[in-house]
Amino acid sequence: MEEFDIAVIGGGPAGIMAAIAASADSNVVLLEKNSSLGHKLLITGGGRCNITNEKPIKKLLNSFHDKNFLKHSFYTFTNEMLLDLFRNRGLDFIIEDNNRVFPETEKSQDILAILKDYLKDITIKYNYKVSDIKKENNFVINNDIIAKKVIIATGGATFPKTGSAGDGYCLTDNPVTDIKYGLVPLITKKDLSDIAGITLYDVVIKYKNFKIKDNVLISHVGLTGPGILNISSEISRNVDYNILDNADVKLDEVLSVDLCPDFNQEELKTKFTNDFQDKGKTYIKNYLKYFLTNNFIPFFLESVEIEGETQLSRINKKQKNKLVEALKNFKFEISAFNKDLSHVTLGGIAIVNINPKTMESTITEDLYFAGEVLEPVGPTGGYNLKIAFSTGYLAGLSASKK
């Protein structure tokens, strides 16, 4: 058997960073079940790699449900420390809207190439799937590797083609929460294929007590875009299911979209009353261009059962109220998650059994966890890579120093 101080399981962002952090003081092996590293990293940000979010740490933490758990790792491995790893190898960064950080080359391959360069003196075993870990005096992995400490960074369960298939959940005695889809496009009950490709800009999406202002992209099967992805995680939290038991989740949820957030309902009613008098000969389909994307108007009018060539002066009070209600609360009935496009896994190894200052299990000594295999998940926009890199670094550092 080969012997190492630390074995890191999983060659994604968290595992790579854990191996880098641990290697300064320890003999490390990185175990990757694929034939190469960083499969999921390569497709993040549409292949451009939205590596982190540049918000100040306090504001960054407020974006997470599990901010108290993440706090120590975020302060231990800051954005500046992360970006300096790449700047020291000649790669700088650009900051785009919503504080999203990308490499200046806009190529995820360049991020991965530098990370691999930091790993050049570390033993890496490819096509190595861990199916068994035994804890004796040390850890025995697949009956052929001995390690004093183990870091599990196997990712989530919702992107199996990249290697994230939930492998890490059953390797230890640490409890696992319900595993759900996160940051996932939504499938609607109504067929939207005729308006696929339309973007609703700067609308307010509402689900129960949660709301967010962002863009909504209409797809052939439903809704996507940053706002939808973020609110999908709230839907997921609200619905009782576990994809390890049943991957096909049926939904009966309703999203409400405020298509005119610059007006409240009374202001819109007043505007309609005045405009319908002053512009009485204008067709409603033309009038709505002031409020809606042009290609969305026929679909919208069909939903309120008003003909597009109806003059404003001929619209009665009931129809006017119906228009106002639809503009302020346009309803989309949701039937399912578009599960094959789930960006992250919601849930994982329960953080109640993890020491947030070290990432060590409180159940099994010398066992650490990092990245998406853990319970926390954040919104879209670089937040989840931030979790991966910071928890990975903290796990690697803690394991090597203990």
Where on the chain are the PLM-derived regions?
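Beta1/beta-strand and adjacent pyrophosphate-binding region of the FAD-binding site
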Residues: E2-A14
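Glycine-rich FAD pyrophosphate-binding loop
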Residues: A7, S23-G46
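Short hydrophobic core segments
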Residues: A7-I9, L31, V130, I145-P160, ...
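An anion/pyrophosphate-binding glycine-rich loop and adjacent beta-alpha core
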Residues: S35-L37, L42-I43, I51-T52, I57-K58, ...
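Glycine-rich active-site loop/strand segments that organize a redox cofactor
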Residues: G46-N98
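A glycine-rich dinucleotide-binding beta-alpha-beta segment and adjacent secondary-structure elements
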Residues: Y126, P298-V377
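A conserved short coil-to-beta-strand element within the FAD-binding core of flavoproteins
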Residues: Y126-N138
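A conserved FAD-binding loop/helix module that cradles the flavin
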Residues: T158-L171, E375-K402
